[in-house]
Swiss-Prot record:
Name the record gives this protein: Glucose-6-phosphate isomerase
Molecular function GO labels: carbohydrate derivative binding; glucose-6-phosphate isomerase activity; monosaccharide binding
Keyword Disulfide bond found: no
Family annotation (HAMAP family): G6P_isomerase
Catalytic reaction list: alpha-D-glucose 6-phosphate = beta-D-fructose 6-phosphate
Organism: Mycobacterium avium (strain 104)
Cytoplasm listed as a keyword: yes
Length: 554
């Protein structure tokens, strides 16, 4: 059943108007004043979910702001929409699909009937098949064509079939315990595949081809080249020993030469950017094992249950989504920095870029009408402390408002002492975490700088205005469960914002036209004869120059 969101324009509601007037009153208030007037703010404007301690006190909001934002969420019927998603209602209206990434992490004894099927049973059937396969791979029972054990799995996919597995593998690679490593190929640029395979042995390499339809151009182009690399070294019969598929298209998988017994499926109610906890995560399970992967899924479920049951006033994803909307629609912010103080989360910001920007980068509401306010936050970031020596200057003293999410851990996976002997390198890392959130919020005044004896002409250059907002997310250690909790925390923020904006956060029509046009242009740039003129003079000139530099008739 399709559920069409028919709410009126949210920007024309009393709840929106109340927030606008509230912003007029408090929008310029400094965080210093908020903390002076409310000394307990730093302890009270926090929420704990699972293993995540979330401090949102350094945001330019008051308790009244939060109350008004929750009123806005209720006006948009967020709770009703959330319940529809968890129940399997077709809330992806443009594609008439349920949205059930949350079902991927339901426990085995749960039941969820959607379109006449218990999807939980289907999910665990695939998880069991993945587990049996990875057990064979990790034990050495599964071998390559020459009888050697597999030591490297190469995931070939793009978009959600790549960004999620890459990020999770890097974050959890310390949990590898069976002598298997993973690599990832996504770009159709041949340099990607060539560099990945350069030092690998075909006899000990297994490819996972991840494509729901098994027809994604970039993925199949890379997979075909990888198959040629295997067959040139080991013969045609080796394909069945060195390739498995994550797909739903048995015919094309079989045509490729992969035994369909080694095909792991997923469903149209799982969007690519929400799929790392499905069979798309097979490369991760192969490295960390089925038990650690189950812990990963359990982390998602912890936050799912919180999002589903906690009152909006204390619901972490809802509050963070509402605060993001406050900055986007009332404070003029356009982007959010994601700053993990963990090198293991180096790819987390890139992962969130797809999750958030492909979901909420929309200019049309679910009912087909144009939006009446800005939508979609631009996500970007790098791990600390690297970012401090790159772009934090703009965060501290620039003219743009950039709310930031700081993510850190009390216990490192590995640690080393500092040369000075005062704590460890991890302590040094986290001292920067705490210092940056503090300085962003409170800054340093001209009077304070002058009092240090700074020359008068230098004082203006050293003023740190502060009032730069941030969220601090602190967990004990980066474990599979904690990573699942972090991902789900952001998934449900995306949902919260999308519901209030009235958009469909689960389609991505904006990526389709470019792919179609690329297919049309490929024969134009490769044909032997001179091509017909393109519809615009810029593309025509570019194509002709490219053809000329490739030695083709222009």
């Amino acid at each position: 059943m399709t559920s069409v969101h028919t709410l009126p324009d949210i920007t024309a509601t009393p709840a929106w108007d109340a927030l606008r007037k509230h912003h007029d009153r408090i929008g310029d208030t400094h965080l210093r004043q908020f903390f002076e007037e409310d000394p307990d703010r730093g302890r009270e404007l926090t929420v704990t979910v699972g293993d995540l301690y979330i401090d949102y006190s350094k945001h330019r909001v008051t308790r009244e702001t939060l109350r008004l934002l929750v009123d806005l969420a209720r006006t948009a019927k967020l709770e009703e929409r959330r319940d529809q998603m968890f129940a399997g209602v077709h809330i992806n209206t443009s594609e008439d699909r349920a949205v059930l990434h949350t079902a991927l992490r339901l426990p085995r004894d749960a039941e969820l009937i959607v379109d006449g099927r218990n999807v939980v049973a289907d999910v665990h059937e695939v998880l069991d098949a993945m587990g049996e396969f990875t057990d064979r791979l990790r034990s050495g029972e599964w071998t390559g064509a020459t009888g050697k054990r597999i030591s490297t799995v190469v995931n070939i996919g793009i978009g959600g079939s790549d960004l999620g597995p890459v990020m999770v593998y890097q974050a959890l690679r310390h949990y590898a315990d069976a002598g298997i490593s993973a690599r990832f190929v996504s770009n159709v640029d041949p340099a990607d595949l060539i560099a990945t395979l350069a030092d690998l042995d075909p006899a000990t390499t297994l490819f996972i081809v991840a494509s729901k339809t098994f027809s994604t151009l970039e993925t199949l182009t890379n997979a075909t080249a990888a198959r040629r690399w295997i067959t040139d070294a080991l013969g045609d019969a080796a394909v069945a020993h060195h390739f498995v598929a994550v797909s739903t298209n048995k015919r094309l998988v079989d045509d490729f030469g992969i035994n369909t017994d080694n095909m792991f499926g997923f469903w149209d109610w799982v969007g690519g950017r929400y799929s790392v906890d499905s069979a798309i995560g097979l490369s991760v399970m192969a490295v960390i094992g089925r038990e650690a992967f189950a812990d990963f899924l359990s982390g998602f479920h912890i936050v799912d249950r919180h999002f589903q049951t906690a009152p909006l006033e204390s619901n972490a994803p809802v509050l963070l989504g509402l605060i993001g909307l406050w900055y986007s629609n009332f404070m003029g912010a356009q982007s959010r920095a994601v700053l993990p103080y963990s090198n293991d989360l180096a790819r987390f910001a890139a992962y969130l870029q797809q999750l958030t920007m492909e979901s909420n980068g929309k200019s049309t509401r679910a009912d087909g009408s144009p939006v009446t306010t800005d939508t979609g936050e631009i996500f970007w970031g790098e791990p600390g402390t690297n970012g401090q020596h790159a772009f934090y200057q703009l965060l501290h003293q620039g003219t743009r408002l950039v709310p930031a999410d700081f993510i850190g851990f009390s216990q490192p996976i590995d640690d080393l002492p500092t040369a000075e002997g005062s704590g460890s390198m991890h302590d040094l890392l986290m001292s920067n975490f705490f210092a940056q959130t503090q300085v962003l919020a409170f800054g340093k005044t001209a009077e304070e700088i002058a009092a240090e004896g700074t020359p008068a002409d230098i004082v203006p250059h050293k003023v740190m205005p502060g009032n730069r907002p941030s969220t601090s997310i602190l967990a004990n250690r980066l474990t599979p469960s904690v990573l699942g909790q972090l991902i789900a925390l952001y998934e449900h923020q995306v949902f919260t914002e999308g519901v209030i904006w009235g958009i469909d956060s689960f389609d991505q029509w904006g990526v389709e036209l470019g792919k179609t046009q690329a297919k049309a242009l490929l024969p134009v740039i490769t044909a032997d004869n001179s091509p017909a003129p393109q519809s615009d003079s810029s593309t025509d000139a570019l194509v002709r120059r490219y053809r000329s530099e490739r030695g083709r008739t222009s």
